[in-house]
Amino acid sequence: IRRVLIILMLLSGWVKAQQNEEIKPNFIIILADDLGYGDLGFTGSTQIKTPHIDALADSGVIFTEAYVSAPVCAPSRAGLITGKNQVNFGYDNNLTTVLPQFNPEYSGLPVSEKTIANRLSELGYINGMIGKWHLGEKEQFYPTNRGFDEFWGYLGGGHNYFPSEYNGAKYDLSL
């Protein structure tokens, strides 16, 4: 009987420990530049097939009442990733090439601003960022220095898939 009681006590402690484990949800935030509301299958598009995004939407939560806090991409990203109105920390326009007269500290999302990835890391999440960053191209602004554990994408903003020509000058802003 003594052995049975000891085993039951140990098992009850293990069961209690299992019950106390917090289940953290996984989540994916999809931000696409210039995407119209009806451009995805689950929002009604019949022209653009998006079966994988539709499946995610089917099994997840969709936020349809969001507010885009800027009309251009980099400030919108800054607002989303910090949870703040980006104008409050001086991020009100798209980034361009850093000119010599500008302080490089201001050529990206201010390092003093915490990101959603920073906050999620504090809660034990592993964070990844895939795609267009456009929140600074210098090392201090890299996604992997802003709370993301992994990054696969490109740091800059707009680009062309093929080499382009502007006023007779050829340029190639590759990925």
Identify what each model region corresponds to.
Residues 1-22:
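Bacterial Sec-dependent N-terminal signal peptides
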Residues 18-175:
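Formylglycine-dependent sulfatase
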